[in-house]
Amino acid sequence: DDVDYFMPSWDDDDKLTTDPKNEVSLIYYPSRAGLEDRVFRIETERSSASTPDTRYNRSISNIEILAQDESRVDLTFQFTTHSFRYEILDTYFGTCRYELDTSGPKPLIKKKYIVLKNDYIHHMLDVYHV
C-alpha cells in the first residue's frame, strides 16, 4: 500500500515548497513502509530523537469533507498541538488534508498533506506533532 505523507517548508518568498524530491520539506515519507518504520521506532523506544518522551495534546477543528464517493473521502481540518519536552512548552498549528481509502473494512490514509503555519520551530518535528 502506498501512502504519501508530506509537510512542505516555506521558501524565502513565503510560498510553500511543492516538490519534496528536489526542495526542502519539513517531513516527507513517499511510502507506507518508511512511515511505519518511523512509528515503530517511536513506539518501541528505538528513536533517540524521541528520548525523553514528548508529552503532547492535539486538537482538531473545522473538519470539512471536500469530496466523497463509494471508496474515497477527501477532508481537511485545522490542528493545534501542544508539546512539552525539556521543560519547554511548544505550540504547533496548521491545516491538514487527508485522502482516505474507504473501500475496505476500515478507512486507510492514502495521503496526508500538512501545512505548518508556525514561523519558528524550536525543536525537531516528528509525526506525532502533526
Q: Could you describe each region identified by the protein language model?
A:
Residues 2-75:
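A solvent-exposed, acidic/Ser-Thr-rich amphipathic alpha-helical stretch
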Residues 64-130:
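A beta-strand edge to alpha-helix "cap/lid" segment located at domain peripheries
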